[in-house]
């Protein structure tokens, strides 16, 4: 059987979502580890006044591509940028470009999607379902297409506790839903959204499930496969440890915790935090396309790309490693010392929100007003709470994913391919990974230099001293207000102090007797 790099040799690849987190990493890995790939066509839309070419130039000039740039200085020559809008008819492609793609493309990686949990149903359907349908329509016309790879999510069927590697029947016919959305106004769509998504937490998971069904039905005559990653996090090893470039998902929460802004969060300490490094997902995606291209399985292949079943990690452990990392290597200009309390209790959660989030933010904004600056902390806290609401469903529950196809795929790889395209999460050491992840948010998201660590540590010590001073003043005030004015309170106080003294005396005496 040919190796993975040999399979991609001379192939023309079509990639959507190249400007997204996973798409960037896939583009870099494909060009670096399969250097004889013929060309990678990337479908990109203009955005914020930038042309597609300018967007790709900016991406390929970032640190993520440093290793590739060193190994293959001319790699950009293989990237062919195509202006496209996936939600428009015919993908908004000109006829000559469309004919070129139909003639030459061998492999499609469909990574494009909206990952916003608060997307309206109309937009989520357009970006996740309609775009997939239209890309499949183009794929069906391609004369040399070997594989269509669709990137989904492990939470597409989060309304089930046990999720197999199959495409489940959809809650509604995607075609009928798309037809209905054409004549509904936004108000009506928003009104029916809760009933449509049912027991799913958001439109993202709902539309990703619909997109899988579209792939199964529309791609019935194609050689298709689906990858379902769970919570995609920073890179494990490639192109270097800790690469992350966005605030999405847990990354934003890690930063908020490191800054001392996030103090409490609704989560189950025992729930599995099914994080999966982005390079694991990319390696598995490239390997899955190789397997389908070489073996041409009779049925659609579905791969649950998760870690919880083979190398479980829990939210309590996430909290511990994030806080310990940021205490050793603090972020610059932290608001408070890092400390997070996870709770699944509704009343405790709202108590800590009021005491640890809103009260300090309110007082800090008063301080900013007094000093003539614009208040900002309450706005930050409000945004943080919105993000927490969207994530608490995933931090409070656990799922069981079947990963037999993932194991099968791993066993099909040659020893060399297992090294180059490693997705064996049993080898993942969580403590090391979490430290690299946190440091990645510091270096690549916040763009903080490691040379600033001494000043950041000094600032954290200053915050500690302020806290100790504040607590001391608080104790003195409580003493003056409550204890010093009440005979009963003084008697209770003296009793507690006497009891503690007797206990310590007994403990010292017992220790002396042992020796």
UniProtKB/Swiss-Prot annotation:
Any one GO MF annotation of this record: alcohol-forming very long-chain fatty acyl-CoA reductase activity
Membrane-crossing residue ranges in chain numbering: 466-483
Coarse class of the protein's main subcellular location: membrane
Side of membrane Cytoplasmic, spans: 1-465
E.C. number: 1.2.1.84
Membrane topology, as annotated: Single-pass membrane protein
Keywords: Lipid biosynthesis, Lipid metabolism, Membrane, NADP, Oxidoreductase, Peroxisome, Transmembrane, Transmembrane helix
Enzyme category, top tier: oxidoreductase
One Gene Ontology term from the biological process aspect of the record: ether lipid biosynthetic process
Peroxisomal side: 484-515
Gene3D superfamilies recorded: NAD(P)-binding Rossmann-like Domain
GO cellular component: peroxisomal membrane; peroxisome
Subcellular location: Peroxisome membrane
Pfam families assigned: NAD_binding_4, Sterile
Catalyses which reaction(s): a long-chain fatty acyl-CoA + 2 NADPH + 2 H(+) = a long-chain primary fatty alcohol + 2 NADP(+) + CoA; hexadecanoyl-CoA + 2 NADPH + 2 H(+) = hexadecan-1-ol + 2 NADP(+) + CoA; octadecanoyl-CoA + 2 NADPH + 2 H(+) = octadecan-1-ol + 2 NADP(+) + CoA; (9Z)-octadecenoyl-CoA + 2 NADPH + 2 H(+) = (9Z)-octadecen-1-ol + 2 NADP(+) + CoA
Role this protein plays: Catalyzes the reduction of saturated and unsaturated C16 or C18 fatty acyl-CoA to fatty alcohols. It plays an essential role in the production of ether lipids/plasmalogens which synthesis requires fatty alcohols. In parallel, it is also required for wax monoesters production since fatty alcohols also constitute a substrate for their synthesis.
UniProt family annotation: Belongs to the fatty acyl-CoA reductase family.
Listed PANTHER family: FATTY ACYL-COA REDUCTASE 1, MALE STERILITY PROTEIN 2-RELATED
Name the record gives this protein: Fatty acyl-CoA reductase 1
Organism for this UniProt entry: Gallus gallus (Chicken)
Gene, per the UniProt record: FAR1
